[in-house]
Amino acid sequence: MMRNNNLKRREPLTDTQLLLTITICIFFAMYGLAMLVWGGGFLRFQQVFDMLNNNAALIIVACGLTIVMIGGGIDISVGGVTALVVMSCIVHMNNGGSIFTAALLAIGIGLCFGLVHGFLISYLEIQPFIITLAGMFFARGMTTIVSLEPQKIAHEGFQQLMKTKIEIPWLGYIAKKGNLIPARMEIGVVVALVVLVVVFIMLKKTRLGRGFYAIGGNSQSALMLGVNVKRTRFFSYLISGLLSGIAGFVFMMHTGAGNATNAAGAEMNAIASAIIGGTLLSGGVGNVIGTFFGVLTLTTIKAIVTTSGLREPWWQSITTGAMLCFFILLQSVVLSRRAKKKAKAKDLLKE
């Protein structure tokens, strides 16, 4: 009896943890199904690394957007800012600029957009959708002004950086000729993973991170608890802009070229990844680890569609839209049932 009393009661999962668990389970279920049905590349670790290599910039953008969405906002300028950074940095380096100054330029452009968006939304209280939509159009227009023609990086040092790969032999595979092909990961993936860890720690351990959840859950309650709502919201957009700038630099490291349509649809893919990862559009609930698995889930869906023989781009859009609706409905049902159980438990305690 004493032993039972001493046992700690297991605390129920929070909404964020519950949705994260669901996302991870669905990702592994989908990837496992792909391995069983199609085999081939899905059986190799390189498939996962390719997913990361191709989506490192999206992971970074989605991390910034997750912060904004947790705070109850939205930022649809991220794709345009990423494209502007890519084109600006390529033109800068092709005209004698260094890699270091290009990196500073990328960060500076991202911070400028984040600063303007954050100020207008937080302190002038203009609707986030309107401001970031204007920011998206402005960034896309500026991208065209920077260069009407597609650009390719001619900087030798940056070309060498692009070719640099991190090889992991023990995760490789044996080719038909019997030689070992190591798994290869680009530098951009390392940057994306570092950003992911830093943002995760910030949201989990810092006062600012907890403030994002507070203002997203209920801004009035957060204000009464002493949270500076305007400043916290301002920082959410500032960080989103910063990460969009970093994402542009990583995108450039992956493609080595730029044009006016770079990162087209990145904002929609980032929003979809965040929602699939368990971030609520209403705010207050979300996690960048969930967003990371949201990106992987979205990429797996597209890979499955392509492997199935449906190579036309609209099939990927249709499937992505259907899966997004499924995840939104799933979140709604799970959280609704959870709320009813909590209400029922409170009623029983009152009795």
Where are these regions (language model features)?
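Hydrophobic alpha-helical transmembrane segments
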Residues: Q17-C25, M51, I59, G80-V81, ...
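Alpha-helical transmembrane segments within multi-pass membrane transporters and channels
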Residues: G97-F137, F293-G294
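Single transmembrane alpha-helix segments in multi-pass membrane proteins
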Residues: A29-L36, R44-N95, L120-E125, A274, ...
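Helix-loop-helix "hairpin" substructures at the membrane interface of multi-pass membrane proteins
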Residues: S98-A103, C112-H117, I121, P169-G258
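Structural signal for alpha-helical transmembrane segments and their membrane-water exit/capping regions
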Residues: I26-L43, G71, T143-S147, F200-R207
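Cytosolic-side transmembrane-helix boundaries in multi-pass membrane proteins
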Residues: M1-F28, G32-L33, G217-Q220, M224-R231, ...
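Transmembrane alpha-helical segments in multi-pass inner-membrane proteins
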Residues: L238, S244, H254-G321
